[in-house]
Design a protein with these regions (language model features):
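Short glycine- and acidic-rich boundary segments immediately preceding or forming the N-terminal edge
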Residues: 1-22
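A residue-level signal for conserved active-site and pocket-lining positions in enzyme catalytic cores
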Residues: 15, 89, 191
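Short, surface-exposed beta-strand/loop micro-motifs that present aromatic residues
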Residues: 17-26, 176-182
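Generic hydrophobic alpha-helical segments
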Residues: 20, 117, 121, 206-209
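Active-site/substrate-binding loop(s) of hydrolase catalytic cores
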Residues: 30-35, 44-55, 59-170, 186
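Glycine-/small-residue-rich active-site loops that bind phosphorylated ligands and cofactors
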Residues: 42-43, 198
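Active-site-adjacent mobile loop/cap segments within catalytic or ligand-binding domains
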Residues: 171-217
Length: 217
């Protein structure tokens, strides 16, 4: 069972729900706000597993923790990278470097923020103004960051053993990291989980991140 409050929700094109879940301190004001989002790409499901595992076994927190376990349920249902409109959500943000590209796995949409999933995430950023954002991807086993997030990236690297990489190694026009980290100056981490890691090992490697976000950050 997942123990968290439903803060907001929307429906996708195919009628699936996207949930924003919240955990806050029980008896005092929160100190910082952290947003953690999984399954931006539908064929990268392990972020949802980690979030749900934490929320089923969570500890107390001094911070306000916001979770989107699965941003792209339509893509996940079809085990594909893109959403129901065949748009790569991580190329659909209204960053200055967004560009109209050929249709395919990396297609960023006909215009920036054309997708309901993207619009929901932008709303959350504007409504809750997080101090730190982490998105969970696969399969490179690295900690990539945008904006003023170097120290947080290094801490997560120390916890997981994944290397810190300031660049993912290829162009990402219209990416979430560029939009939030570089242009909005919000510390933004793209945590690349390993490919097809056994679930128990994946949790053991990454559970310290949630303790850090709840108690230390």
């Amino acid at each position: 069972m997942i123990f968290a409050d439903i803060e907001a929700k929307i429906n996708t094109k195919n009628g699936n729900e996207i949930l924003l879940l919240k955990q806050e301190p029980k008896d005092r004001d929160y100190e910082k706000t952290v947003l953690i989002a999984g399954v931006i790409h539908g064929d990268e499901p392990d972020g949802e597993y980690l979030i749900n595992h934490y929320l089923s076994n969570k500890t107390d927190t001094k911070n306000r923790l916001l979770f989107i376990p699965c941003l792209n349920p339509d893509g996940k249902a079809q085990n594909k990278r893109t959403n129901a409109n065949n748009v790569d959500l991580n190329r659909n943000f209204p960053a200055k470097n967004w560009e109209l590209t050929e249709k395919g796995d990396f297609f960023g949409g006909e215009k920036p923020a054309s997708e309901v999933e993207t619009q929901f995430l932008i709303y959350i950023i504007e409504r809750y103004v997080p101090d730190l954002i982490i998105t969970l991807h696969e399969p490179y086993s690295v900690v990539n960051y945008d904006g003023p997030a170097k120290s947080e990236a290094q801490k997560i690297s120390d916890i997981t053993g994944y290397k810190v990489e300031e660049s993912i190694g290829y162009p990402t026009p219209g990416s979430f990291g560029t939009y939030c980290g570089i242009e909005k100056n919000i510390p933004t981490i793209t945590l690349e989980l390993p490919e097809k890691s056994p679930k128990d090992k994946l949790w053991e490697t990454n559970k310290g991140i949630f303790d850090y976000l709840a108690k230390e950050y």
